[in-house]
């Protein structure tokens, strides 16, 4: 089978862009090589591997898991089914966090729900400081540690159920906790079917994890420290009420490129 023939079969199942992306991954070649040499033959192993990848994608498996990586904030992160796939909207959380740190400062930073480590590692590299990151999943932390080693980031990863194994206070606490309601029909659709449910959903309204974080965060924030949390597209008002109920003031709300509030932040009173 030639590259051109393999692509033609794959396009009928998963579309042209993904067919080319998976073929590049299998062959380790560029898009220009594929375009220039459609007559080039695949060996038996390559053809079998490519057919398997196409079948898995056609069944709905996320491209990021098939490739084993996903780009986030200009860097490639290893991903496996043990971690949530990094999303572009989470870059808003990183950008907001960076805006809270003055140039030259070396803040003490905590990331809640590390997953692949994309947020903690990005902050560590962008700020040039050490970051602590927690996750309840040992499997997720293994992926995060690999990413930190690969990218050269100073991150202390701790297996912890939110603040349970954490001592001390921080200048900046960030988190992308699960915020989808359990039973939400979207959880049975698309890529979400393959991602770790504990990283996606928590509680009947999706806010159970956030309530736990807000209950303990004041004990771990330095005076003047910031708490920044990503949340669902329709949870801005609920977040305002929860943050006010937890005694926080000076609420900030940050919108994504579509104008939707996706990050809420508060400052610990001096």
Task: Specify the residue positions occupied by each region the protein language model found.
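Residue-level signal for inorganic ion chemistry
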Residues: 22, 60, 90, 119, ...
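Non-catalytic nucleic-acid substrate-recognition regions in nucleic-acid-modifying enzymes
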Residues: 1-16
């Amino acid at each position: 089978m030639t590259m051109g023939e393999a692509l033609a079969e794959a396009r009928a199942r998963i579309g042209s862009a993904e067919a080319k992306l998976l073929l590049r991954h299998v062959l380790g070649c560029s898009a220009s090589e594929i375009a220039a040499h459609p007559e080039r033959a695949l060996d038996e192993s390559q053809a079998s591997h490519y057919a398997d990848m196409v079948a898995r994608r056609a069944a709905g498996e996320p491209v990021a898991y098939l490739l084993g990586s996903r780009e986030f904030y200009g860097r490639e992160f290893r991903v496996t089914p043990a971690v949530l796939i990094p999303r572009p909207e989470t870059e808003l959380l990183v950008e907001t966090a960076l805006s809270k740190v003055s140039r030259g400062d070396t803040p003490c930073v905590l990331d809640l729900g590390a997953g692949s480590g994309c947020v903690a590692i990005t902050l560590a590299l962008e700020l040039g400081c050490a970051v602590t990151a927690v996750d309840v999943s040992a499997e997720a932390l293994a992926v995060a540690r690999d990413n930190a080693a690969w990218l050269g980031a100073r991150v202390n990863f701790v297996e912890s159920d939110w603040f349970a194994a954490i001592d001390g206070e921080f200048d900046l606490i960030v988190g992308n906790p699960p915020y989808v309601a359990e039973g939400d029909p979207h959880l049975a659709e698309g890529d979400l079917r393959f991602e770790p449910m504990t990283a996606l959903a928590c509680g009947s309204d999706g806010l159970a994890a956030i309530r736990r974080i807000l209950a303990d965060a004041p004990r771990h924030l330095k005076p003047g420290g910031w708490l920044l949390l990503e949340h669902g597209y329709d949870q801005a008002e609920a977040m305002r009420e929860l943050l006010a109920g937890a005694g926080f003031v000076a609420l900030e709300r940050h919108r994504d490129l579509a104008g939707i509030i996706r990050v809420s932040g508060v400052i610990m009173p001096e």
